[in-house]
Structures are given as C-alpha cells and as structure tokens.
Amino acid sequence: MIPAEFPAILELNSNYACRSKCRRAFFFGAKQMTDAEILTLVDRLERCLLAKEEFHHRDHLSVAVVYLYACDLETAMDRMRSSLKRFASHHGVAGLYHETLTRFWLLQVEQRLDRRQCLEDSVRKAQEQLSDKNLAFEYYSRERIESKEARETWLEPDLKNA
C-alpha cells in the first residue's frame, strides 16, 4: 500500500519525462526500482514490514530521496528519524539509530537532488553517487563519528565540511 501523500510525488514527477531507458537495469545486483516500488519500500519501512536484513544502505538513500521530494529538509529529517527509530525498535535494536550519520546522508542526498528528474532517476542517481558507505569518514574522524554524542545529536564534521 502506497502512503496517501506519495501519489502527489508521482504526479509531480509525471511532468518530467523519465530519462531511464532501462527499468530492468541492474545496479548493486538488484534491478532498478520503479516509482511504485520505491514508494512501496517507504511504506514497508514506515509500517515495519521489512525484515532487518532487507533494509540496506541503498534503501536508506531511496527513502531519503522520497522524503526530500515530499518535504523540506527539516521535515524530511524528522520523518527519517522517526521511521528509522521505529524500525530499529521494532527489530529490537533501538540503540542502532545514529543522528549524525542520518543527517549526514540526508544532506548528501539533498545536495545532489534534482527535483525536475523523475523519482526513479533521482533514486538511481543517489544510489550511484553515494554508494560508498565509508564516505562519512572523509568528513568525520572515526573517533568523532563513533562517539555517543554523534549517535544522539548532530555533530558537524571535523575533517571537511559536509
């Protein structure tokens, strides 16, 4: 089931021709997701219908794109935080959520987001450009990013600006 507010995203995107030529293109060993599949992923995350093992880095990026299409940065951050905390709690790993990393990745997605593109192209672009999970270590020292404070609150990068 696709959340009620998300059809507006599809409507917004219908104004722009999707530049993806091959919906079956393989990326990270999985086919490129369609708009409906992306929105279903968000719905399944929000309703905790995904197994913990089903939600990977590329899925975090997909959700970030959807939230940033639907809302401003702070509202998207609130939704991302809420969804991830609920998901982690549901799977018995409530302490897994990391505020600094969540905001870092959301900012990285926002910087690359072109809302004139269709949703699936934006997701594909985010997944291609932000596939390296270690990117955060170009901005943060290991000590800083692994601190309790970074897990609980937003910390500015200590190596270079995000």
PLM segments and residue spans:
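Intrinsic-disorder-associated interaction segments
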Residues: 31-34, 116
